[in-house]
Curated annotation (Swiss-Prot):
Present with 2550 molecules/cell in log phase SD medium. GO terms for cellular component: cytoplasm; cytosol; nucleus. Keywords: Acetylation, Phosphoprotein. It comes from Saccharomyces cerevisiae (strain ATCC 204508 / S288c) (Baker's yeast). The modification N-acetylmethionine is found at residue 1. GO terms for biological process: apoptotic process. The lineage of its organism: Eukaryota, Fungi, Dikarya, Ascomycota, Saccharomycotina. This is Uncharacterized protein YMR074C. The modification Phosphoserine is found at residues 121, 126. Coiled coil: none annotated.
Length: 145
């Protein structure tokens, strides 16, 4: 059996044990759930509004990117609170929400650096003008004249 597949299965099993009401204080399952920041697993509050495949997808995303899974959950909670959900959310809709959140986070992280340089000829002209003024002021101090 593939070791990555085994790790995913073990993480999912630990998550299912957490969901079944394991309040015995098991710290290992909290670590597998993304650091145990929240005692409730991702998607538990909105599970009634998700299809099983969508909940599974959200759970798998939470294993890798807990922040994005929580952002999806927050977004869906807002939709539910405003009664904008008329059907169970599908896996495809979860994927599209995830893509939107990823684009939003990437656009916030991207910064644009703009270089504005002066024209060299303008600097040279201003330098020549300054030197011409300085030469006029120092006519009586010329050593070689």
């Amino acid at each position: 059996m593939d070791p990555e597949l085994q790790a995913i299965r073990e993480a999912r099993l630990a998550q299912l044990k957490n969901n079944s009401g394991g309040t015995n204080g098991d710290r290992n399952s909290g670590a597998n759930n993304g650091g145990g920041e929240n005692s409730a697993p991702v998607g538990a509050a909105i599970a009634n509004f998700l299809e099983p495949q969508a909940l599974e997808r959200l759970s798998r995303v939470a294993l890798v990117r807990r922040d994005r899974a929580q952002a999806v959950e927050t977004y869906l909670k807002k939709l539910i609170a405003t009664n904008n959900v008329t059907h169970k959310i599908t896996e495809a809709e979860i994927v599209s929400i995830l893509n939107g959140i990823a684009k939003q986070q990437n656009s916030q992280n991207n910064s644009k650096i703009i270089f504005e340089r002066k024209d060299f000829s303008e600097d040279l002209n201003s330098f020549d003008k300054q030197n011409a003024k300085n030469d006029d002021d120092e006519d009586d101090d010329d050593f070689f004249d």
